[in-house]
């Protein structure tokens, strides 16, 4: 009797060995792809503190830009190159333009900033082509010198957009709210990538440093606690 042999069926796999040309996968992803988006669009970081001191000395300490390099992390130098005209309320001159040197994420850069102080309320600094968010009436004492108002800090290599804005709000006799909003955009993805691990922490680090300085100065100099802005000169009483 003849033996009947059946051919073994061919097993078909459900796995596709090839993908269509429309489903191409990037073999080597661009490490700067995300950073490129971050460098072109300004990022905003915020931080807030409530301090148990009057608002006047807190504001004066925050507006004391020449002292930043002595206590502020990442700030290596802070020089004021122009001062405002005396404001109409306190007769004080305020920082109006400065050169700050900062370093973080392996990058060190010096850049010009225009500074705008609304006594007792705001301290704002802007760099590059960034415009102030404050009204002309609020910063009239900064605009009396037309040359300052028209200056642009377009020579910054590190940042193409920069705005830091301190808001000081009196919440009670010895209670003050302090808020910091920091906007920045790097000039290219390389800088954004290098600073990626550090940049998100900057606002909180800055406001913590100011908080510590306020507490230290006012405990060492109790007379500053009750002083008005007219009696203060930066981080000390007028002599």
Predicted regions and their residues:
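Hydrophobic ligand-binding cavity/cleft-lining segments
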Residues: 2-94, 99
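Alpha-helical membrane-targeting segments
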Residues: 3-14, 103-109, 185-205
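Structured catalytic core of nucleotide-sugar glycosyltransferases
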Residues: 41-47, 113, 228-239
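Intrinsic-disorder/low-complexity, polar/charged segments enriched in Ser/Thr/Lys/Arg/Asp/Glu/Gln
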Residues: 42-48, 95, 110, 161-163, ...
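Hydrophobic pocket/interface hotspot
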Residues: 58-59, 68, 115, 180, ...
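Glycine-rich portal/gate segments that line the openings of hydrophobic small-molecule binding cavities
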Residues: 81-153, 236-238
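Beta-strand/loop substructures that line and gate deep hydrophobic ligand-binding cavities in soluble
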Residues: 127-205
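A conserved amphipathic terminal alpha-helix motif
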Residues: 192-231
């Amino acid at each position: 009797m003849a033996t009947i042999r059946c051919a073994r069926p061919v097993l078909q796999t459900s796995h596709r060995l090839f993908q269509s040309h429309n489903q191409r996968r990037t073999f080597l992803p661009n490490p700067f792809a995300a950073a490129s988006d971050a460098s072109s669009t300004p990022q905003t970081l915020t931080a807030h503190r409530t301090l148990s001191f009057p608002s006047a000395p807190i504001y004066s300490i925050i507006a004391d830009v020449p002292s930043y390099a002595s206590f502020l992390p990442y700030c290596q130098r802070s020089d004021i190159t122009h001062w405002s005209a005396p404001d109409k309320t306190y007769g004080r001159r305020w920082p109006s333009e400065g050169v700050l040197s900062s370093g973080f994420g392996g990058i060190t850069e010096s850049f010009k900033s225009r500074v705008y102080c609304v006594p007792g309320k705001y301290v704002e600094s802007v760099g590059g082509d960034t415009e102030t968010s404050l009204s002309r009436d609020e910063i009239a004492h900064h605009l009396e010198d037309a040359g300052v108002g028209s200056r642009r800090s377009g020579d910054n290599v590190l940042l193409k957009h920069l705005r830091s804005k301190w808001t000081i709000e009196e919440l009670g006799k010895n209670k003050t709210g302090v808020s910091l909003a920091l906007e920045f955009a790097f000039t290219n993805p390389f800088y954004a990538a290098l600073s990626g691990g550090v940049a998100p922490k900057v606002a909180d680090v800055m406001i913590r440093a100011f908080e510590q300085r306020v507490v230290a100065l006012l405990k060492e100099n109790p007379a500053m606690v009750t002083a008005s802005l007219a009696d203060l000169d930066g981080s000390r009483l007028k002599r």
